[in-house]
C-alpha cells in the first residue's frame, strides 16, 4: 500500500475520532430566551408524574410493566417532558405522605427508590423524553421542609390534615432561617446530583434524559418580614449555585408557583429569578385552590378562571421577557364536573380549560415566544381506584393526586378520552408549527 494512501486513511480515522469526541449530549439549554436542543422542541406540552421513581422500583409500590405502558402512552400522545419527584423524605406510614420514601433519615436512603429513578430515566431516554427532577417540597406530602426541621431538632413535623394549614405554614416558615435544616438539605442535593445511574452507568450530570434540576415543589417563604424573605432568596440562590457547581450541564429551575407562592409579592419573585444560576421561570395555576371556581361554579365561573389565568401568565411573561428567560407553566389542574372523583365522570369544564391553556402555548410556538412549556397536573394514566378509600392508602395504585388529596381530584386517566384528544390536538399543533 502506498505511503500516501496509508497517511490518508490515518488522517480520515483521526478526523472521525475527533468528530465523535466533539459530539455533545443533547442537553437542553437557554439561548436568547428559548429552549435549545439538537433533538428536542423549543415548546412543549408535558405532565406531572410525581410517582415515576416509585413505579420504576423493584420494591414496594414498584410496577415496571405499568411504568413502561405509561411512558409509551405519554410518548404516543406527544408528551416528552415529565415533572418527577426525586423521592420523599422521612419514615413511611405517616398520614398524607407518599410512601415508600427515598430518604429515611438524613443521608440514609432506600436504594430501591433510587434504582427506580435510575430505571425511569433509562426508559425515558429510550423514548427521547426528559425529566424535570424536583428535590424538595414546601408541603407535607413528601416530607420536605417539615421533615428537615424535625431532623434539625426543631420539633415534630406537623400534618395539615391534623392541625390545619395555618399552623402548618407557620411551622415550616422556620425552614429558611434554620441553618442546620438547610445544611441537611444541601447534603441531600450533593448526594442526588452526584449520583451515577445503576442502569446505564452514566452519571446524572452526563444524562441528557434530565431536562432540569428543580430546587423544590412550590418553594415558599411563608413569611412577609424582610429577614425571612432575604433568607428565602439566599436559600434559593445558594441551592441553585450548589447544583450548578456539581452539574454544569443541566439547567436549574426554582419550582415556584409565581407571585402566588411569593406572598403575592412580584418583587420577591423577581429577586429569586434574577439569579444567574436559575435558567428559566416557573408558574403554577390552580383555579379551584385559589377560589376562582368552587365546587358548584366549575362551569359558571370557568370564564373567570380563564381570564385570571391569562392575566397571571401575562404578568409573569412580562418579567420573563425582561430577563430573557423562558416561562413554563409546570402545574395546573381543574376538577371533574360537579366535583366528582370517579373515573368515567364528565370532564367538560376541565377540557375547555385545558384547551384554552394549550392554545396559549401553540400561539407562543407560532410567535417564537418565551411562553415555552406546560405540564398539567397530573397524570393518572392506567391507575385503578379504590372502591373504599377516598384518600390513598398503602397498596392503592398511584395516580396524579398525592396522598393528601382525594384520589381522582385532578388526575387525568387514559379513560378520559375527550381529554386525550385535547392533549393530542395540542401536541400535534405544536409539532406542525415547529416543522415550519
Regions found by a protein language model. Name each.
Residues 25-292, 301-326, 332-352, 356-359, ...:
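Active-site mouth of glycoside hydrolases
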